[in-house]
């Protein structure tokens, strides 16, 4: 008597996303090659033609393929997403299917993008002091940021600096997705009226945001007009 037993194993492909600029709804295309072009069948709902199958997997999801014959060699490759800003690392992308332990393949795509923030100081009005220094505070939602970014030095997500009229400071390479708030000290006691644009918002990768603060100060005087008559024959009633 000769007894035969077929053995099968599983292949699990996991897709991970990392970085500050990712979309969990994005799908990523994979090619699974079983290194045997005689395989024309379906394993675990995945159809293989001449030993090759193409599948799409969303970020942070996985695909399990059961019923692959024990001892089958495999190679998993992901489409090249460098053009979309992703850097890809992989683990166990090649190997052999085993009956006892599933083959686990992991791909991690990382994408980080960065944006810039510029704070402008402008003056207007007939009594603005061009030598006046104005104090600003920039607060980021990420309190772990403590470093120099362009013209701004942050400590625990906060940067302070002074600007005169016509000057600006630029923070470069701030992480995509963090929020910011720019506050100028109150100078109303000096007669300034302040208007501002984009003083709060969210940093967007590969974009530049301009926060503009305009302080206006006008002063006004009075004009008195008097009429003086001279001579020995004037009419004071005129």
Describe these PLM feature segments.
Residues 1-238:
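Solvent-exposed loop/turn and edge beta-strand elements of beta-rich ligand-binding domains
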């Amino acid at each position: 008597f000769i007894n035969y037993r077929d053995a099968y194993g599983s292949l699990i492909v996991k897709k991970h996303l990392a970085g500050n600029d990712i979309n969990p709804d994005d799908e990523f295309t994979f090619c699974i090659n079983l290194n045997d072009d005689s395989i024309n069948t379906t394993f675990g709902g995945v159809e293989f033609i001449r030993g090759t199958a193409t599948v799409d997997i969303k970020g942070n999801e996985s695909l399990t393929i059961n019923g692959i014959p024990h001892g089958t060699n495999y190679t998993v490759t992901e489409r090249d997403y460098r053009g979309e800003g992703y850097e890809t690392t992989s683990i166990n992308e090649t190997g052999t299917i085993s009956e006892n332990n599933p083959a686990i393949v992991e791909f991690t795509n990382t994408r980080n993008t960065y944006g810039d923030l510029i704070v402008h100081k402008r003056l207007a009005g007939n009594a603005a002091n061009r030598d006046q220094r104005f104090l600003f505070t920039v607060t980021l939602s990420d309190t772990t940021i403590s470093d120099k970014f362009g013209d701004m030095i942050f400590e625990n997500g906060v940067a302070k600096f002074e600007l005169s009229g016509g000057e600006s400071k630029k923070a470069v390479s701030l992480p995509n997705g963090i929020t910011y708030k720019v506050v100028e000290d109150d100078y109303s006691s000096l007669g300034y009226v302040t208007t501002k644009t984009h003083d709060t918002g969210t940093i967007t990768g590969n974009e530049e945001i301009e926060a503009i603060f305009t302080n206006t100060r006008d002063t006004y005087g009075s004009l008195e007009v008097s009429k003086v008559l001279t001579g020995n024959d004037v009419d004071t009633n005129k």
